[in-house]
Amino acid sequence: MTKSMYAYVRDAWKIPDDTGVKALLWERMQDWRREGSIVRVRRPTRIDRARALGYKAKQGIVVVRVKVRRGGRRASRYVRGRRTARMGVNRKTMGKSIQRIAEERACRKYPNMEVLNSYWVGEDGRQKWYEVILLDPHHPSIINDKTLNWISKPGHRGRSERGLTSAGVKGRGMRRRGKGTEKCRPSVRANANRAK
């Protein structure tokens, strides 16, 4: 069976050391570090991943690259007296994934658009980069697209902030069912944050 062009691109990203993707990323990230936190890109860096997640090269669809710092929460130190070990500054794990934070920031930057999905494009010791696919739900080309017009319905408004994207559903524990998931539904907060 013959492989498509997208299959070759996907295989290249799976083993970046052997295929030259690592060297290409190393060069690109030098430019990305100088850029702002949210940058609109002309075309996706990983066309195979973008197409698999619903990207189409048409009006009403935008791809932005978002830079988010790595690691746990940057909690501020307490002003009140207590010993350092009890300040709760270090080793604070976030309740959201970095990918989910990237989606929310992209949505805030483009308030007239909705997040379709996102994917990883690179990381170094300090930052991670994700490309977020955004759709304009009121654009005629989206409304007339039978595979994407579901996002124009009112129920999908603000889907990234409500954890309805793929990264959001995963972070809320909705990928699992059965034993061990009793506290995941109806939501994490409904069960006093005992789900995670």
UniProtKB/Swiss-Prot annotation:
Domain of life according to the entry: Archaea
Name of the protein this chain belongs to: Large ribosomal subunit protein eL15
Gene3D superfamilies, per the entry: Ribosomal protein l15e
Residue stretches in coiled coil: none
Protein keywords: Ribonucleoprotein, Ribosomal protein
NCBIfam families, per the entry: PRK04243.1
GO molecular function: RNA binding; structural constituent of ribosome
GO cellular component: cytosolic large ribosomal subunit
UniProt family annotation: Belongs to the eukaryotic ribosomal protein eL15 family.
BP-aspect Gene Ontology terms: cytoplasmic translation
SUPFAM superfamilies: Ribosomal proteins S24e, L23 and L15e (SSF54189)
Region (Disordered): 154-196
